[in-house]
UniProtKB/Swiss-Prot annotation:
Tissue specificity of this protein: Sperm.
Name of the protein described by the UniProt record: Major sperm protein 1
Compartmental location: Cell projection, Pseudopodium; Cytoplasm, Cytoskeleton
Chief location of this protein within or outside the cell: other
UniProt keywords, alphabetically: Acetylation, Cell projection, Cytoplasm, Cytoskeleton
């Protein structure tokens, strides 16, 4: 049973943070490469702390071992002098898919008692 084994590692490029540069009167897009470094198929999903400002595409998916996906993180226009820009981040969550499951993302994989791993990527805004 896949859920009894902890999910393996993922690698992201960039590895530790996402940086958006001013001005913020135009939409910015930053690309992140996510690689499944483990030996099992995983389901992954992205969460953001600021749904109004930050968008992700695709927001979830399935990766076989050693497979990767290029994901776009977009930052919509905003007034950096009036809004709090200190605590934004995206969180990548991933878990092993059940044995024999189709390669189609299912939200319920994250709602059972299997282990879910997380990686936080803080957002840095250069003014």
């Amino acid at each position: 049973m896949a859920q009894s084994v902890p999910p393996g590692d993922i690698h992201t490029q960039p590895g530790s943070k996402i940086v958006f540069n001013a001005p913020y009167d135009d939409k910015h897009t930053y690309h992140i490469n996510i690689t499944n470094a483990g030996g099992r198929r995983i389901g992954w999903a992205i969460k953001t702390t600021n749904m109004k400002r930050l968008g992700v595409d695709p927001p979830c998916g399935v990766l076989d071992p050693k497979e990767n996906v290029l994901m776009a993180v977009s930052c919509d226009t905003f007034d950096a002098t009036r809004e709090d820009i200190n605590n934004d981040r995206i969180t990548i969550e991933w878990t092993n898919t059940p044995d024999g499951a189709a390669k189609q993302f299912r939200r319920e994989w994250f709602q059972g008692d299997g282990m879910v791993r997380r990686k936080n990527l803080p957002i840095e805004y250069n003014l």
